Amino acid sequence: MKDSIINKLESLSERHEELQALLGDPSVINDQDKFRAYSKEYSQLEEVVTTFNRWKKLNSDIEEAQILLDDPDMKEMAAEEIAENKAEIENLEQHLQILLLPKDPNDEYNAFLEIRAGTGGDEAGIFAGDLYRMYSRYCESKRWRIEEMSANESEQGGYKEIIVKISGEGVYGQLKFESGGHRVQRVPKTESQGRIHTSACTVAVMPELPESEMPEINPTDLRIDTYRSSGAGGQHVNTTDSAVRITHIPTGIVVECQDERSQHKNKAKALAVLASRIVQVEQERQAAEQADTRRNLLGSGDRSDKIRTYNYPQGRVTDHRINLTVYRLDEVMNGKIDELIQPIITEYQADQLAALSEQA
């Protein structure tokens, strides 16, 4: 392992010890804001320090075992121990490099998940409902909480658009690679000839920003319209103008919310989503500027950015970004999507490591 990496790990170990002492300091214990901040930093360093300590111990054990190589009675056992330790050290070094990769500060945040029906008419709306069910099941398995922000139901079932907030540990970091175009190939229930149709939905995942990080939005840049909440088919389900539509004039971003009976609550929810969308648009612009030399696995949420195909006749799901295909469509649609999410995260980390190597 490079000296620069070892030096970085040593400094993190020192910081870990320093934090341990601070967390036992009465003045810190009595200051809840400081205590929370130090506790969070301490827990974030825990894995890297534990792994580094293991790495150091194995290297020390190898040095001791090498002395025994001169002893005929111990030579075979020592050689075996050295080989085992070297294999583990190799794995630990790779893991440590991943742990040292720059962290996306948004990864620990809650997230807004937006699913919009695209091409395909009613079938696209039904597929949007299927995707929402898939993500809901996944969230249940992670014990994350889902709160509906806005839903525009489709007449044949499913949704024209649905936005939910997902709360839990590391939600955005786990789901951010789901952004992009999702395509389905299947025979619709309404298809009498048995022909396979292709429909599409767009998924966008945005971090829920804390108030301190929300962009300043000039009230004069907003157009706020109110109207009566409506269900599938357009029928009104409320007698007051509680639904809210907010347009951010400079960017053209439009957010609607009609989930709550209170206009005030709908407005607050819509503003929270709007703030995240504005930040996302700016981040996408910056990413596009940097994407000339390196591929971007983070989907843009653009309809043309096709990331995944769900093929029902063949029972397969294909992720086009890394050419991954799994033949467990039923399990995937029931929320077992870790086998799609984790390979993308691993590939992203590999790209980051490659970029760091080029800079070194």
UniProtKB/Swiss-Prot annotation:
Keyword Protein biosynthesis in annotation: yes
Keywords per UniProt: Cytoplasm, Methylation, Protein biosynthesis
User: What organism does this protein naturally occur in?
Assistant: Actinobacillus pleuropneumoniae serotype 7 (strain AP76)
Taking the first listed entry, what is the main subcellular location of this protein, grouped into a coarse class? cytoplasm
Instruction: Give the similarity note.
Output: Belongs to the prokaryotic/mitochondrial release factor family.
The record's subcellular locations are: Cytoplasm
Q: Which SMART domains match?
A: PCRF
Instruction: Name it.
Output: Peptide chain release factor 1
In this UniProt entry, the residues modified to N5-methylglutamine are Q235
List, in alphabetical order, the Gene Ontology terms for molecular function in this entry: translation release factor activity, codon specific
Keyword presence, Cytoplasm: yes
Gene encoding it?
A: prfA
The record's section on NCBIfam families has: prfA, PRK00591.1
PANTHER family the UniProt entry points to? LD18447P
- Region annotated Disordered sits at 285-309
Q: Name one GO cellular component term.
A: cytoplasm
Q: Which domain of life is it from?
A: Bacteria
Q: What does this protein do?
A: Peptide chain release factor 1 directs the termination of translation in response to the peptide chain termination codons UAG and UAA.
PTM annotation: Methylated by PrmC. Methylation increases the termination efficiency of RF1.
